[in-house]
């Protein structure tokens, strides 16, 4: 189903954006596993945050202080609905340690993808 947008037709969501906040040291393994699962392309951002893990205490020049935001990595991938389950299962399996602080996965509908260089849209732009 398509609806008219500004210069492009906007399709109803058939693609999903997966954002996963994971531990730094799990990044390479997750990247390799997603590549094997036929997920192509990834954006990686250094982020800081906290959840149930909260912060931790550190010593600096003899003084103790609390670090509220912990360093993590956020990976973003866009997949078709047919690859969604495999991609999410892969991230869960590879990034999980079983400890607090393993991270979160967020899944959102993606209305459109446009390749800037060619103007291709949808799956062909991925």
Predicted feature locations:
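Positively charged, small/polar-rich N-terminal and surface patches that mediate targeting and assembly
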Residues: 2-126
């Amino acid at each position: 189903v398509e609806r008219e947008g500004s210069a492009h037709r906007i399709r109803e969501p058939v693609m999903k954006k997966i954002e996963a906040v994971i531990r730094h040291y799990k990044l390479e393994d997750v990247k390799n596993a997603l590549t094997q699962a036929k997920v192509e392309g990834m954006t990686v951002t250094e982020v800081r945050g906290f959840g149930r893990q909260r912060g931790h205490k550190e010593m600096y020049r003899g003084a103790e202080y609390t670090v509220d935001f912990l360093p993590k990595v956020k990976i973003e991938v866009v997949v078709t609905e047919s690859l969604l389950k495999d991609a999410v299962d892969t991230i869960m399996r590879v990034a999980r340690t079983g400890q607090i602080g393993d991270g979160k996965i967020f899944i959102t509908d993606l209305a459109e993808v446009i390749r800037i260089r060619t103007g291709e849209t949808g799956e062909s732009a991925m």
